[in-house]
């Protein structure tokens, strides 16, 4: 699927139908179908040939494809094992992608990823955004750049001023 744009709704529907995959909304599986948003995330990740980048929850490979197109050295985590057949189909031509089918919240990130200076990109489901952010912060990994698409409510909590209504543990963890 080298020439297919995975951010196109028709391509997503075709791929999902072809491999018999149905999104699991209990896992927050809502796939990006806005090419402009996917391109903006990939551009903001500041990637070039060989840049180590970690993607959290690859989904059907929409953002994964855009990140891989930069030539970055991409390691993607995916929780849902049933997406393997989708990702094998959509990303088969890319040699710079390594996918780990494991829950990033339970993975030994330091052992898996080592001490390289990482960039991190993701389209995060609402229900797990805070646990993922806290896991990454507490992992001790050398991550120099985070680029996440998330719900506005979570972003508001992250950016809240001290003492504001949305101020909390997430605010403190991210800002300090």
Task: List where the protein language model places each region.
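Catalytic cores of RNA-modifying enzymes
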Residues: 1-176
């Amino acid at each position: 699927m080298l020439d297919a744009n995975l951010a196109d709704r028709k391509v997503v529907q075709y791929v999902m139908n072809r491999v018999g995959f149905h999104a699991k909304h209990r896992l927050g599986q809502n796939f990006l179908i806005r090419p402009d948003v996917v391109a903006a995330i990939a551009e903001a990740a500041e990637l070039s040939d060989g840049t180590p980048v970690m993607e959290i929850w690859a989904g059907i490979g929409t953002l994964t494809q855009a990140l891989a197109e930069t030539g970055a050295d991409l390691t993607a985590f995916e929780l849902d094992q049933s997406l393997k057949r989708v990702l094998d189909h959509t990303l088969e031509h890319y040699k710079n992608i390594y996918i780990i089918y494991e829950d990033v919240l339970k993975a030994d990130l330091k052992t898996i990823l080592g001490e390289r200076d990482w960039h991190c990109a993701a389209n995060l489901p609402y229900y797990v955004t805070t646990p993922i952010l806290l896991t990454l912060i507490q992992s001790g990994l050398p991550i120099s750049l985070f680029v996440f698409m998330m719900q506005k409510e979570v972003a508001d909590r992250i950016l809240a001023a001290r003492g504001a209504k949305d101020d909390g543990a997430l605010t403190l963890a991210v800002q300090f």
